[in-house]
Amino acid sequence: MVRLIVGLGNPGPAYDRTRHNAGFWFIDRLAAAHGCVLREESRFHGRVGAINLTEPVHLLAPLTFMNRSGLAVAAMARFYKIAPEHILVVHDELDFGPGVVRIKRDGGHGGHNGLRDIMAQLGSGGFLRLRIGIGRPAGSMAVADYVLAAPSVSDRQAISGAIEKALACLSELLAGHVEQVMNRLHV
């Protein structure tokens, strides 16, 4: 059962519209859909809230910058005594095109610095990941420049569509039906 949903991104207006903030876009949509206003909480190094689906679920958008996301996740997990297997981390994914969304259980960080830090801080990679496709840069554009740039209008629409697909499956996912959600999203 998922008790904490974390949306990854970078804080501040300079990053609001960048691909790397797909996790923030998800968490903000989820909070808004449930009438939840995320508030800054210094002890958790992020914006936090809670929604009630089948059970209360904590929401977190770390304000530590991507590479230090683990600080916020570990602080909240320790405070609420949430084991890694009850955490869902939502993040941008270079390996999938815009509009693609996938669930992954456990695993490595795949070069994603936010995931790398969360794994280091939790001492485990045993959390669920909701991977929102943003695609790869074309030509010789550096990956760092790509993820820190705004997507095209069509890519942003595709990413928004992926977020909506994921939100439509969320109750089922939170109830622990990971395989069924994988079957719905991985088509």
From Swiss-Prot:
Pfam families the UniProt entry points to: Pept_tRNA_hydro
Database matches in SUPFAM superfamilies: Peptidyl-tRNA hydrolase-like
Record-linked Gene3D superfamilies: Peptidyl-tRNA hydrolase
Binding site for tRNA: Y15, F65, N67, N113
Gene Ontology molecular function, alphabetical: peptidyl-tRNA hydrolase activity; tRNA binding
InterPro entries per UniProt: Pept_tRNA_hydro, Pept_tRNA_hydro_CS, Pept_tRNA_hydro_sf
Compartment(s) of residence: Cytoplasm
Gene Ontology, cellular component aspect: cytoplasm
NCBIfam families: pth
Protein name (database record): Peptidyl-tRNA hydrolase
Species assigned in the record: Methylococcus capsulatus (strain ATCC 33009 / NCIMB 11132 / Bath)
Lineage of the species this protein comes from: Bacteria, Pseudomonadati, Pseudomonadota, Gammaproteobacteria, Methylococcales
